[in-house]
Amino acid sequence: LRASWGLSGNNNIGNYEHTATMSQGGYVYGNTVETAYWQGTFKDAAIGWEKTSQYNVGFDLGLFNGRVNLIGNYYNSLSYDLLYDQPISSISGSSSVKTNLKNAKVRNSGVDFQIDGRILTGDFKWNVSANISVNRNKVVDLGGINDLYLVSERNVVSHVTRSGLPIGSFYGYIADGIISEKDYTNIMIDKSNLVNGKFPDGYQLIGPAVPNYNNIHPGDVKWRDVDKNGLITENDREILGNAYPDFTYGISTDFSYKNFDLRATFTGSQGAEVINFQKYYLYNMEGSGNQLASRSE
């Protein structure tokens, strides 16, 4: 049996990150070019390491004179004083300053299991090993900061970091199919009932909700109206998943007979989700570029 605890720091902040610098330039004052100085970079003088406190408990078990070995481990780590590029007003001359998010915490916890076996019979030797790992990532607190958004392709928000969820969860609208000719007819009926961009109280949509009633066509994506207000807005974005797998695993084996040997290793992960941006470009129906033929279906 074994147990351990440790405190480590992430110092990936570069040298002199706490030191602001001055910039120099010239300006014309009367008939003379004068030299001027201003603060060129903004720094947090109190910036420090991002810290991670972690404990582990586990066991190592050997059976049958060491021919079968079992290894198990449980870990729980808490990272705090997270490093973050805090946005600041652009009138300051900079767009962000690297700092520690006070009271912000991220937890990683999980288990690892491994089993090893050996067969030794004369000139024949065979070793096989299998392992499985499960990790859970969770933002415990953002230290009073609102949701952190990541903007990706076409300046679209695609990820969000939010308390209670894994870091960088996928975030966006839910597609419910394609707008048909019948949908379009009903949408135009709904459009005729709009008053100053809103529907009268109690009005029931005939067609699907759309983001812009003045720019909609058959074949456009039909988005889910999550808040049921009859319009597709930013409030209809939902958590779509995350890139963390349910578990990862691996198997390795090697055997030998006299002067012949063979080795093989297999690794994999299960349950991870991805954003297919290649599919986005081939199905987005924007501009005059080529699209996959199946898009017409």
Model-derived features: where do they sit?
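C-terminal beta-signal and adjacent terminal beta-strands/loops
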Residues: S79, R136-K138, I216, S256-E297
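Extracellular/periplasmic, surface-exposed regions of secreted and cell-surface proteins
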Residues: L1-L165
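Conserved small-residue
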Residues: L120-G241, Y281-M285, N290-R295
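Extracellular/lumenal carbohydrate-interaction signature centered on repeated Trp-anchored short motifs
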Residues: Y244-P245
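Short helix/loop capping segments that flank catalytic or ligand/cofactor-binding pockets
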Residues: N12-I13, Y171, K182-D183, R263-T265, ...
